[in-house]
A protein has these predicted regions:
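N-terminal active-site beta-alpha-beta segment that forms phosphate/nucleotide-binding
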Residues: 78, 84-273
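Short beta-strand segments
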Residues: 56, 94, 138, 212-216, ...
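Acidic-glycine-rich active-site phosphate/pyrophosphate-binding loop
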Residues: 64-75, 174, 206-207, 259, ...
């Protein structure tokens, strides 16, 4: 209870806690002669190395681990839209780095023209996926930072660069570097946030528990650790021996291709099941808790997540199993009153009947309905785990408290 009400109490010490825990885990692995238990953490969904943006192509997992280079705004948009990079926090990070990459070819010397170019690029990238709020959040943060910098030139004639000795240097180039720096801050903050959510989430779980998860909210969906899989990884390093059941997550099979791959790679006891098997494993008494991520949470606690999440939540309620939704504060949208106002992305029907098969698995011309997300009503959510603490109902009151500090 103290941890829940403290809110930010441990947040200031998260980096220290993370360094200490990671050092202890490395020491334990070294003693066991196994340095690769968490090698999955080396596969960041977005990397920025030697001025190159690289994205792990998650559509090729688990068969291939391939990074692709992002050179234009179109590359970044396509990578997000086609799910080469996915997961709400990860696409926020990708959008931020992508904004910088998109501005490298800007050759002008007027800061106001540069600002307009950034605005147009940001608006374009924001259309890649409509449901997850992290894209717009990250892009707005970058734009706000740029506005503060450019405001210094508001009085400059015609928006030209200042050329006095005091302001020597190319301010447009400086602005570009500031965008890169902001992207790096967003990545580092997400890594710290995921670790904090892992610590909070682990406090709700006990060794040996059976845990069901849906879709993929692991390390390749975030900067590192994951959201709802973070406590699984921390528990693995601390000997909790969780038994995880991963829904395959139709139609794009993120649970089968990504979650089971991540967890197996990390030595976690994971069992893959079809989505329509969630009820029977609950009825069998194999599930003690459900953990899921979130792509956008409304002010009242309704949470949009991968299609099928709502059904799992309803089942958990029926069987008396706690349902925990992991939501970084960057994913909480207080401007959206309820889940009814969250836009739901609709995707092409081929993902249902053709994408994973050698031959179409449905009659030619059949109509399809393929929403990428559904909204879980707040009444089915036992608790919301954020990097600032554990939030319980009433969500319309307590979620706002996270932003009062």
């Amino acid at each position: 209870e103290k941890r829940e009400t403290a809110g930010m109490a441990v947040w200031g010490d998260v980096r220290g806690l993370r360094r200490k825990a990671d050092a202890q885990a490395r020491s334990r692995r070294k003693k066991k002669g196994n340095e690769s238990d968490m090698e999955v953490f080396d596969l960041a969904p977005v990397k920025f190395e030697e001025d190159e943006m690289l994205v792990l192509d998650q559509t090729k997992l688990p068969a291939e681990e391939v990074y692709i280079k992002m050179e234009t705004k179109e590359d970044v948009w396509d990578a997000i839209h086609t799910l080469k990079v996915r997961g709400a926090p990860a696409i926020g990070v990708a959008a931020a780095y992508g904004l910088y990459v998109s501005t490298r070819d800007f050759a002008g010397t007027r800061v106001k023209e540069f600002r307009e170019y950034v605005r147009e690029t940001s608006a374009y990238l924001n259309t890649a996926r409509p449901t997850a709020v992290n894209i717009s959040w990250a892009l707005k943060r970058c734009e706000d930072m740029l506005d503060k910098y450019i405001s210094a030139f508001d009085n400059a004639a015609d928006g030209f660069l200042c050329t006095c000795e005091h302001c020597a240097g190319d301010q447009v180039d400086d602005a570009k570097l500031l965008l890169l720096d902001e992207a790096e801050k967003i990545r580092k903050e997400d890594e710290a946030a995921c670790y904090a959510m892992g610590e909070y989430g682990l406090s709700l779980l006990s060794p040996g528990m059976g845990i069901l998860t849906h879709c993929n909210a692991g390390t390749i969906a975030t900067a590192k650790y994951g959201t709802c899989l973070a406590p699984i990884y921390l528990g693995q390093e601390r000997g909790y021996n969780f038994r995880v059941f991963a829904d395959e997550t139709r139609p794009l099979l993120q649970g089968a291709r990504l979650t089971s791959w991540e967890l197996q790679k990390s030595g976690v006891d994971v069992t893959l099941i079809c989505d329509n098997m969630a009820s029977i494993v609950m009825k069998n008494g194999w599930i003690d808790a459900v953990v899921v991520g979130c792509d956008r949470m409304a002010a009242n606690g309704d949470g949009a997540n991968k299609i099928g999440t709502s059904g799992v939540a309803i089942l958990a309620k029926e069987y008396g199993i706690p349902f925990y939704m992991y939501v970084p504060t960057s994913t909480i949208d207080l401007a959206t009153p309820t889940g009814a106002e969250i836009p739901i992305e609709l995707r092409r029907g081929e993902e249902i009947y053709e994408m994973w098969y050698e031959k179409p698995m449905a009659p030619v011309g059949v109509k399809t309905y393929n929403p990428s997300f559904d909204v879980t009503d707040h009444k089915y959510i036992t608790a919301v785990i954020t990097e600032k603490g554990i939030v319980r109902p009433p969500y319309d009151v307590n979620l706002r408290k996270l932003f009062e500090e």
